[in-house]
């Protein structure tokens, strides 16, 4: 691998722009369909767009702020010294592959990926497990670096520090590289988007692309009539299954009667009373319009409906 550019004096905008020039570690899981928070469809639109999006949230902020601490805990636990990479790296054999490494292991052909994890996601790391999109990220780093192994240290808030060592598996890396290069060659380069997979990320991206509507236009959907038929078939099946599910729940309730809880091997059932207060918005708008307007806001969205005309 080679150092593409130092990140020591690189602005956040330039850093993001360089990442558009190839596939990075955080792209890998999305391209493979393994990332629950990002899709290949989103990666595609990020790569072809000239817009630099500064996406950030509290979890990402904490991850950055605590990276030093996780690296320090890793050194304490393993005795391995680490150093900052301070660069965007590029695979010499596969120039499309780029990487930003959290840390490199001193004196070894190895690196370290630091993660911070909510305690609510601790089960995803239980019993030696590693989330699939993080495995893809680490394997991407192994592909770029040509190193022998990579460590991943995950700090689960309030619980523990989990450390795993992932060794190079040539078959896995070759498959990953092939998938990434296929994505770039057949999607990004010709600007042909991958087919949406039904993920929440795909929905967000599509809604962002087409947030406004033209009510003077009607699209001819005859070419995808088969998709509409398939959707209707699925809707009918879902409706039937929902009814069957509700019938089962009704039988369970009849069995429980006034019991708040029920048990069966492998199951815990609860049927408990709860109270909640809800604002009567219509009455508030009528009787206190000033207060209603003061605390109301306009939310713009496009409502999507399909009506089947038999």
Where are these regions (language model features)?
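Accessory terminal regions of nucleic-acid processing enzymes
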Residues: 1-310
């Amino acid at each position: 691998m080679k150092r593409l550019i130092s990140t020591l004096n690189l602005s956040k905008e330039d850093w993001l722009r360089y990442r558009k020039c190839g596939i990075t570690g955080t792209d890998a899981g999305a391209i493979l369909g393994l990332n629950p928070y990002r899709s290949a469809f989103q990666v595609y639109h990020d790569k072809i767009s000239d817009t630099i999006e500064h996406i950030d949230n509290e979890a990402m902020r904490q991850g950055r702020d605590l990276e030093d601490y996780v690296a320090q805990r890793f050194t304490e636990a393993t005795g391995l010294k680490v150093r900052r990479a301070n660069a965007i790296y590029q695979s010499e054999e596969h120039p499309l592959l780029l990487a930003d490494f959290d840390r490199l292991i001193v004196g070894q052909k190895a690196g370290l990926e630091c993660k911070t994890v909510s305690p609510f996601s601790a089960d995803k790391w239980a019993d030696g497990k590693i989330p699939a999109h993080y495995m893809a990220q680490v394997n991407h780093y192994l592909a770029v670096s040509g190193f022998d192994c990579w460590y991943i240290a995950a700090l689960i808030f309030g619980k523990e520090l989990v450390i795993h060592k992932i060794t190079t598996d040539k078959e896995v890396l070759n498959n990953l590289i092939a998938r990434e290069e296929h994505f770039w060659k057949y999607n990004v380069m010709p600007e042909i988007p991958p087919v949406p997979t039904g993920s929440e990320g795909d929905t967000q991206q599509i809604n962002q692309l087409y947030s406004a509507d033209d009510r003077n236009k009607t699209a001819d959907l005859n070419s995808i009539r088969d998709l509409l038929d398939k959707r209707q078939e699925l809707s009918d099946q879902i409706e039937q299954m929902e009814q069957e599910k509700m019938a089962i729940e009704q039988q369970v309730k009849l069995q429980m009667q006034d019991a708040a809880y029920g048990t069966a091997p492998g199951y815990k059932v609860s049927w408990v009373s709860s109270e909640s207060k809800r604002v009567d918005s219509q009455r508030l708008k009528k009787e206190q319009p000033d207060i209603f307007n003061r605390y109301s806001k306009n939310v713009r969205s496009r409502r999507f409906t399909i009506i089947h005309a038999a």
